[in-house]
Design a protein with these regions (language model features):
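Charged/polar, solvent-exposed surface patches and flexible loops
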Residues: 2, 33, 99-100
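Active-site loop/short helix in cyclic nucleotide turnover domains
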Residues: 3-8, 53-61
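Alpha-helical scaffold within the catalytic cores of cyclic-nucleotide enzymes
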Residues: 6-47, 51, 72-85, 95
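Residues embedded in well-ordered beta-strands
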Residues: 1, 46-48, 90, 123
């Protein structure tokens, strides 16, 4: 999991997340070309991106804690990542992220995800400027 906006504000968090996802997919594509040349199976990656308020900080006990992030936006991103296997897209995003860079995205579907009573509009990444 990766996140932006904590501990310091990050106004371009959505753009950074989209560019990072694009770079991840490009690196996996390069690695898969090498694996193909070796006759080895390819790797797949699924990326779910969502934006929203979260609780961020050190969580756990004094003897063992992690700096982590919790909240509905995180859970939704996880659900989106899980849905990538149902589409021919390695990256799926919620509207809360898409609103920041709609020109970089295309609509994929409206889906039901666990923990949500209403349908979630899902988008993927296209036309990204570096």
């Amino acid at each position: 999991m990766a996140f932006w906006g904590a501990p310091l504000d990050c106004e371009d968090h959505a753009e950074r997340a989209m560019l990072t996802a694009k770079d991840m997919v490009a690196l996996i594509d390069d690695l898969n070309a090498e694996l193909d040349a070796e006759g080895l199976p390819n790797l797949n990656v699924g990326v779910g991106i969502n934006s929203g308020p979260c609780v961020v900080g050190n969580m756990g006990s004094q003897s063992r804690f992690d700096y982590s992030v919790l909240g509905d936006a995180v859970n939704t991103a996880s659900r989106l990542e899980g849905q990538t296997r149902n589409y021919e897209e390695w990256i799926l995003m919620g509207e809360s992220t898409v609103q920041y860079k709609p020109e970089w995205t295309k609509y994929v579907d409206s889906i039901q995800v666990k923990g949500k009573s209403e349908l979630l509009s899902v988008y993927t990444l296209t036309n990204v400027a570096d």
